[in-house]
């Protein structure tokens, strides 16, 4: 019986009779079962923490009146975005750790790449919008309610999603218009553009340039918005006479600046580096960091030193405790 080909072997043999790949196989770090079980448990714990942490921020932001301000609305959208971003990648990855059949359909791969690109790009724009929000709140606090009214922050959030969907659509259509007539094995835990281009049998030079310029433009624009916003914030801090006022500003901006540095630092390391330093394993590790690990870290970063969020969570817990006692 051991000499009979497995289902996966039969599928690979059938590929020779077709001109186009209709399914992909996701190849992760290792084929050793014990290691895969460990990775399954590790990333399951990370995913559960991501869900609990981010939804634990969304609920008080929605339910607590004291958090009904643009700054916390942006944070709530970011937390919801992180849940979506992680959910696009993690469940399929967890299944593949334990499953013998690690395949994903052509349409499923395109959908996963489109959603991951959409949520990842939206996070870039949203972090820039949050920097502008903090600039308005600190540099001109008396006009904050006017400068950051629903007529301003709702279009900012909407535009972030619309621009990201457009960006993701262009890259997804361009990538899956290529021919995949050779190997169908993707050395990655999810469908991402670089490993897909690596297995295409078409000329990918134009698409690689398109991808580089699009990602580079988004990074430059969003980072510039962050830098300009924090430049004005720094000027406002230097004008402050109160040490308590400076402490509040650092507390308000420190978490966001940390989140921006980690996220954009990872993206820049991923895409703005010499091609000679590219390896599929490094690509996989960095991709896991910004799609799975960062969404887990964000609730810690944004709530650890935020007294308003911690007080809102306490009020929510006390309120639920009293309701259960009635």
Swiss-Prot record:
<keyword id="KW-0552">Olfaction</keyword>
<comment type="function">
    <text>Odorant receptor.</text>
</comment>
<feature type="transmembrane region" description="Helical; Name=4">
    <location>
        <begin position="152"/>
        <end position="172"/>
    </location>
</feature>
<comment type="similarity">
    <text>Belongs to the G-protein coupled receptor 1 family.</text>
</comment>
<dbReference type="GO" id="GO:0005886">
    <property type="term" value="C:plasma membrane"/>
</dbReference>
<keyword id="KW-0675">Receptor</keyword>
<feature type="transmembrane region" description="Helical; Name=2">
    <location>
        <begin position="67"/>
        <end position="87"/>
    </location>
</feature>
<dbReference type="Pfam" id="PF13853">
    <property type="entry name" value="7tm_4"/>
</dbReference>
<dbReference type="GO" id="GO:0004984">
    <property type="term" value="F:olfactory receptor activity"/>
</dbReference>
<dbReference type="GO" id="GO:0004930">
    <property type="term" value="F:G protein-coupled receptor activity"/>
</dbReference>
<dbReference type="GO" id="GO:0007608">
    <property type="term" value="P:sensory perception of smell"/>
</dbReference>
<dbReference type="GO" id="GO:0007186">
    <property type="term" value="P:G protein-coupled receptor signaling pathway"/>
</dbReference>
<feature type="topological domain" description="Cytoplasmic">
    <location>
        <begin position="305"/>
        <end position="326"/>
    </location>
</feature>
<feature type="transmembrane region" description="Helical; Name=5">
    <location>
        <begin position="209"/>
        <end position="229"/>
    </location>
</feature>
<keyword id="KW-0812">Transmembrane</keyword>
<feature type="topological domain" description="Cytoplasmic">
    <location>
        <begin position="230"/>
        <end position="249"/>
    </location>
</feature>
<keyword id="KW-1133">Transmembrane helix</keyword>
<feature type="topological domain" description="Extracellular">
    <location>
        <begin position="88"/>
        <end position="111"/>
    </location>
</feature>
<keyword id="KW-0297">G-protein coupled receptor</keyword>
<feature type="transmembrane region" description="Helical; Name=7">
    <location>
        <begin position="284"/>
        <end position="304"/>
    </location>
</feature>
<feature type="glycosylation site" description="N-linked (GlcNAc...) asparagine">
    <location>
        <position position="101"/>
    </location>
</feature>
<protein>
    <recommendedName>
        <fullName>Olfactory receptor 5T1</fullName>
    </recommendedName>
</protein>
<dbReference type="InterPro" id="IPR017452">
    <property type="entry name" value="GPCR_Rhodpsn_7TM"/>
</dbReference>
<feature type="transmembrane region" description="Helical; Name=3">
    <location>
        <begin position="112"/>
        <end position="132"/>
    </location>
</feature>
<feature type="topological domain" description="Extracellular">
    <location>
        <begin position="1"/>
        <end position="37"/>
    </location>
</feature>
<feature type="topological domain" description="Cytoplasmic">
    <location>
        <begin position="59"/>
        <end position="66"/>
    </location>
</feature>
<feature type="transmembrane region" description="Helical; Name=1">
    <location>
        <begin position="38"/>
        <end position="58"/>
    </location>
</feature>
<feature type="topological domain" description="Extracellular">
    <location>
        <begin position="173"/>
        <end position="208"/>
    </location>
</feature>
<keyword id="KW-1003">Cell membrane</keyword>
<feature type="transmembrane region" description="Helical; Name=6">
    <location>
        <begin position="250"/>
        <end position="270"/>
    </location>
</feature>
<dbReference type="GO" id="GO:0005549">
    <property type="term" value="F:odorant binding"/>
</dbReference>
<dbReference type="InterPro" id="IPR000276">
    <property type="entry name" value="GPCR_Rhodpsn"/>
</dbReference>
<keyword id="KW-0807">Transducer</keyword>
<feature type="topological domain" description="Cytoplasmic">
    <location>
        <begin position="133"/>
        <end position="151"/>
    </location>
</feature>
<feature type="glycosylation site" description="N-linked (GlcNAc...) asparagine">
    <location>
        <position position="17"/>
    </location>
</feature>
<dbReference type="InterPro" id="IPR000725">
    <property type="entry name" value="Olfact_rcpt"/>
</dbReference>
<keyword id="KW-0716">Sensory transduction</keyword>
<keyword id="KW-0472">Membrane</keyword>
<keyword id="KW-0325">Glycoprotein</keyword>
<feature type="topological domain" description="Extracellular">
    <location>
        <begin position="271"/>
        <end position="283"/>
    </location>
</feature>
């Amino acid at each position: 019986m051991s000499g009979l080909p497995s289902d996966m072997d039969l599928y690979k043999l059938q590929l020779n009779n077709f001109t186009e790949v209709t399914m992909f196989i996701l190849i992760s770090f290792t084929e050793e079962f014990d290691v895969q079980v460990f990775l399954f448990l590790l990333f399951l714990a990370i995913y559960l923490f991501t869900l609990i942490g981010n939804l634990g921020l969304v609920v008080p932001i929605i339910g607590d009146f004291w958090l009904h301000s643009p700054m916390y609305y942006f944070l709530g959208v970011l937390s919801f975005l992180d849940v979506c971003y992680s959910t696009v990648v993690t469940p399929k990855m967890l299944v593949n750790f334990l499953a013998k059949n690690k395949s994903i359909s052509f349409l499923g791969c395109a959908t996963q790449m489109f959603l991951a690109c959409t949520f990842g790009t939206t996070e870039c724009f949203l972090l820039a919008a949050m920097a502008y929000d903090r600039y308005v709140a600190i540099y001109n606090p008396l006009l904050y309610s006017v400068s950051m009214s629903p007529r301003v922050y709702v279009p900012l959030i909407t535009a972030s999603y619309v621009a990201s969907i457009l960006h993701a659509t262009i890259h997804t259509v361009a990538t899956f218009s290529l021919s995949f007539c050779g190997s169908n094995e993707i050395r990655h835990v999810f469908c991402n553009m670089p490993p897909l281009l690596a297995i295409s049998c078409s000329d990918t030079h134009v698409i690689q340039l398109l991808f580089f310029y699009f990602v580079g433009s988004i990074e430059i624009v969003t980072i510039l918005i962050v830098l300009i916003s924090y430049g004005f914030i720094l000027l406002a801090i230097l004008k402050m006479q109160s040490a308590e006022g400076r402490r509040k500003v650092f507390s308000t901006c420190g978490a966001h600046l940390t989140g921006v540095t980690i996220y954009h630092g990872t993206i820049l390391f991923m895409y703005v580096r010499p091609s000679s330093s590219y390896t599929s394993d490094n690509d996989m590790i960095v991709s896991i960091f910004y799609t799975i690990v960062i969404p887990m870290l964000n609730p810690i970063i944004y709530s650890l030193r935020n007294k308003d969020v911690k007080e809102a969570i306490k009020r929510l817990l006390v309120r639920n405790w009293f309701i259960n006692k009635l």
